[in-house]
Amino acid sequence: MKNRLSKKRNDYPGHPRVAVGAVVFRDECVLLVRRGQPPAEGLWAIPGGSVEIGETLQKAAEREILEETGVQIRASKPIYTFDVIDRDMAGKVRFHYVIVDLAAEYVLGEPSPGDDALEARWVSAGEIHNLKVSPATVNLLKNRFGFGS
């Protein structure tokens, strides 16, 4: 049972997994989700998820953002890359994601949480300081866009 759950949630991988996120702005707000699964469970972050076999980064981002938020986007070029490596108490790698965040253009839709997102919404620069936001998301938004500075 544990082995099936571990494989289902991508725990204890044999190799790093590639994942994408999409940075989407609308009316001076950024689209964020509150994660419902590890890694970053409970934190607000750029929406995204795993790339499937045969899928481009752009198509993966468009699919994942639609699944997690109900918002349609048009993804473009990579703008930020980072690793998420989480180890268990014994030091064994529990998760290892290589995450590529892409710039994206809002197309249509209103945020509604889906897939593994607990919440999804547009967040203004003024309110981002009141949320528990993942460090990678804070770094990206502040350093690349001056958002929330």
Stretches found by the model and what they are:
Residues 38-44:
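A conserved beta-turn-beta hairpin within the catalytic core of GNAT-like acetyltransferases
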Residues 46-79, 102:
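The catalytic Nudix box helix
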Residues 26, 34:
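A cytosolic small-molecule/anion-sensing beta-strand core signal
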Residues 82-110:
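Active-site-adjacent beta-strand/loop module that shapes the phosphate/pyrophosphate-binding cleft
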Residues 101-103, 112-143:
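NUDIX/MutT-family hydrolases
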Residues 1-21, 92:
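Acidic, metal-coordinating catalytic segment for phosphate/diphosphate chemistry
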